[in-house]
């Protein structure tokens, strides 16, 4: 089973692959559903594909907006460009875009996006008959339904296994349109995440009088889903015939992407190694608790979710750790590493490391010097690079993190 990770920009793409993803999905500056996710220029996409292929890994490009007429302009040449740079596939949700892809870039594999709401085997078979090589199933499909679809249709199936959930059916939401008077449209890449807002109730005969719904003093989070987490169910996903496990999060941090990928990499590899002897290790789940997240749920995997799949207490996710630094270079000959600051830290404090191999251990911030060779007591400046003395083995791209207060 492929491990597929989000890549909101070049740094996230490289970190995802280095921490164990088999493939990444990303968007260009147009035609994707995360207009505010950073995204890639054409030149960056070409570089990303070359980098991934050098590592023996894959890149999928999202072209999954639900377009209006004006959105179609230039799409044919864009798809042809993706074919020319040898992207491994495009993700598409719209039949018209699918047609353009077949005409303009016939050698470019097409994966059907979850936005297409493929929730049954007849729909999946129809997409296959039209030329799709993979279908990303709707998030509303259960594990048993996944297995049944795979038995009936010989095609690659991709499913979301971790990350934020949309409150609407496979993302077909108009809340952003409503709250912005049509200026921000979710299905054209401009979601404002209105499902995370705080709401109160107004009775129509009493305009201007707002009533709480007995959750807290801020209102009610009636659309606020918990986050999906399927790390405890890797065997069931593989046995159901899932070809690719997808992690949500093109707008999440570098730290989030790396840590989540590392945990799922270990779980998937462990199942393939141990088979029937496989068991879920507590440190995998602990790692997922250390990233920004809401309480976890298995959503639709085993049954239609009830009220327990919603988070009623608050809309903001937990953020138990701060990402404070990234190792850029390791110099074993003199026991130093070059670290790029991501949050304030100081010499002498004990922090935690996460390496690209997925190893986790504490380390003391050693003697620091700045780029001018001057001693530094702390690292207060965003993205400043410092040399740190350490006896630990900290390879490039190791993450330094610190537990937040409380």
Enumerate the language-model features and the residues they cover.
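Glycine-rich, positively charged N-terminal anion/phosphate-binding segment
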Residues: 34-51
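Gly/Gly-Pro- and Ser/Thr-rich, intrinsically disordered tail segments characteristic of DNA damage-repair
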Residues: 73, 107-108, 112-121
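Short beta-strand elements of ligand-binding domains
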Residues: 61-62, 92, 111-114
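Surface-exposed amphipathic alpha-helical tracts and adjacent flexible/coil segments at the periphery
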Residues: 1-18, 23-30, 49, 55-65, ...
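Short glycine-biased active-site loop of nucleotidyltransferases that positions the nucleotide triphosphate
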Residues: 102
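Alpha-helix capping/helix-boundary segments
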Residues: 96-97
